[in-house]
Structure formats: structure tokens, C-alpha cells
Amino acid sequence: MLTREEVQHVAHLARLELTEEEEIQFTEQLADILAYVEQLKELDTEGVEPTFHVLDAELPTRPDQVEPYPNIEGILANAPDRADMFFKVPRILEGED
């Protein structure tokens, strides 16, 4: 069973601030989703070919082109930490600097 503390932990990792009501709501909703996934794990899928797309459709592509973004300050205004025009995030890998 999913606990409220686990939801708080995941919210913290995602840098989300949840109200008490949201914590309760998400705990219930995520517990329901996880219970459904457990039901799916019990299904016998032996011999069932994996489905990647329901419809045979290809997404249109375009050439990669560098284009200036018009509102960089607007995006960076939501960053918990930044250095000049970049998001600053905690180091997660050890080794090379």
C-alpha cells in the first residue's frame, strides 16, 4: 500500500509543493493505479505480441533548427536555482568535473 510519506518523498524529489489535501488525493489515486497495475501483472500474456502503436501512424518530422526562444526569463523565473541563463541542478554523478 502506498503511504502519504512516499507521496511526500516523490513530490520532494520532483520539487513539487503539495497541500495536505493534494497529498491525500494523490495518495489515494496513485494507490488505485498501483493496484490496477498489480492486476495487470496477473494476466497471462504468453504468446501475445507486444503492441507499440494501436494505429499504424507516423509522426511528421522536420529538420532540427536552432531558434531563439522569446521568453527565456519567463521560464527561468520558475527555476528553484539558476546560473545566468541556465537551470542549476544538484550534482548526481561523481567523477569528472
UniProtKB/Swiss-Prot annotation:
Top-level EC class: ligase
Gene Ontology terms for molecular function: asparaginyl-tRNA synthase (glutamine-hydrolyzing) activity; ATP binding; glutaminyl-tRNA synthase (glutamine-hydrolyzing) activity
InterPro entries registered for this protein in UniProt: Asp/Glu-ADT_sf_sub_c, GatC
Keywords from the UniProt entry: ATP-binding, Ligase, Nucleotide-binding, Protein biosynthesis
E.C. code: 6.3.5.-
Function: Allows the formation of correctly charged Asn-tRNA(Asn) or Gln-tRNA(Gln) through the transamidation of misacylated Asp-tRNA(Asn) or Glu-tRNA(Gln) in organisms which lack either or both of asparaginyl-tRNA or glutaminyl-tRNA synthetases. The reaction takes place in the presence of glutamine and ATP through an activated phospho-Asp-tRNA(Asn) or phospho-Glu-tRNA(Gln).
Family, similarity comment: Belongs to the GatC family.
Assembly and interaction partners: Heterotrimer of A, B and C subunits.
Name listed for the protein in its UniProt record: Aspartyl/glutamyl-tRNA(Asn/Gln) amidotransferase subunit C
Organism: Synechococcus sp. (strain JA-3-3Ab) (Cyanobacteria bacterium Yellowstone A-Prime)
